[in-house]
Amino acid sequence: MADMKWAVAHIKSSFNNTIITVTDITGAETIAKSSGGMVVKAARDESSPYTAMQMAGQLADQLRDKGINGIHIRVRAPGGNKQRSPGPGAQAAIRAFARAGIRIGRIEDVTPVPHDGTRPKGGRRV
C-alpha cells in the first residue's frame, strides 16, 4: 500500500463529447489522453457511456504499463453560462476505471460556475 503511485484523471463530459486527460499529481505533465472521436468514428456516439467505458479501459491499461495504480478524478461539465451537469460519459468512465482495477482516491466536481457572469442565450421569459 505504501508504493501507491497516483495520477489525476480530468474528465470533461458534455452532451457532445467526452474527453479524458490523465496527468501527474501536480497536473503539469500529461501521461495519457483520449476523446470520443479517438474511439468511435460516428459523431453521434462520441458522448455515449459505452464510448467513455472504452476510453477509460484503454487509459487504465496505459496507466498500469506506466506503474500508476491510483487516480484522483476531477469531473467537469461545460459550465459558465452553459450546462452545469456533466454528460452521460462521466459516470460510465468512473465505473470503468474502478472495474479495471485502478484505485480511486477523490472524486471532485470542477465545473466552472459564474459569479453572475454574462447573459444566458435565449429570449426573455415572462
From Swiss-Prot:
Gene Ontology, cellular component aspect? ribonucleoprotein complex; ribosome
Q: Which domain of life is it from?
A: Archaea
Q: Which UniProt keywords apply?
A: Ribonucleoprotein, Ribosomal protein, RNA-binding, rRNA-binding
Q: Which Gene3D superfamilies match?
A: Ribosomal protein S11
| Transferase among keywords | no
MF terms (GO), sorted A to Z: rRNA binding; structural constituent of ribosome
One of the GO biological process terms: translation
Which family does the record assign?
A: Belongs to the universal ribosomal protein uS11 family.
Described function: Located on the platform of the 30S subunit.
Known partners and oligomeric status? Part of the 30S ribosomal subunit.
Task: List the protein's name.
Answer: Small ribosomal subunit protein uS11
Supply the source organism for this entry.
Methanosarcina mazei (strain ATCC BAA-159 / DSM 3647 / Goe1 / Go1 / JCM 11833 / OCM 88)
